[in-house]
Amino acid sequence: MDMTTKSCREFVTVLASNEPAPGGGGASALVAALGTALGNMVGALTVGKKKYADVEEEIKALMKKCDDLQAQLLDQVPADAEGFVPLAKAYGIPKDDPSRPEILEKATITACQVPMHIMELCCESLDCIATFAAKGSRLAVSDAGCGATIVKAALQAASLNVFINTKTLQNRAVAEEMNAKCLGMLDKYGKLADEIFDTVKAGFFK
């Protein structure tokens, strides 16, 4: 079931239940889509204004990219649920079954893929929001700051859905490769999100 077709209230109700999905990954994707949309809104409030005519084409291009990012992020909500299914089934295999370790290992790697992709999309979103914050309408700059803060939270949340799985991998080389990629994104784009927030906030105290 694609929870993105449900109401906000329905999504939250199911999220709070004992259903296996949506979980942290799906919630991260939805939150990232919301943060991206806030940045995109800044673009929508910039286009068509004479004051920003010199950056209009750049803003339009960013809006188109964000439209795509929003759609991709929403697609990750059901994708994350689907990615968890093999892992749930693997845990159900009797511990004395000789096939269990290999099946569990493969399922664990599969379960990492969607949250890692969510992180990658969050990074792309933050790059866009940085430009919206710097060049978009000053009347909506707070929304760019909000978007950056929200997408950062989604980035961090998605990373935990990777780390909980890499911790259990027997192939430590694969685990460390995934961890390094995620930690790199957290470091670089966590700092970018903080810079956006700090710059936007500072502008209100000048």
Where are these regions (language model features)?
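Short, hydrophobic/aliphatic alpha-helical segments
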Residues: M3-A21
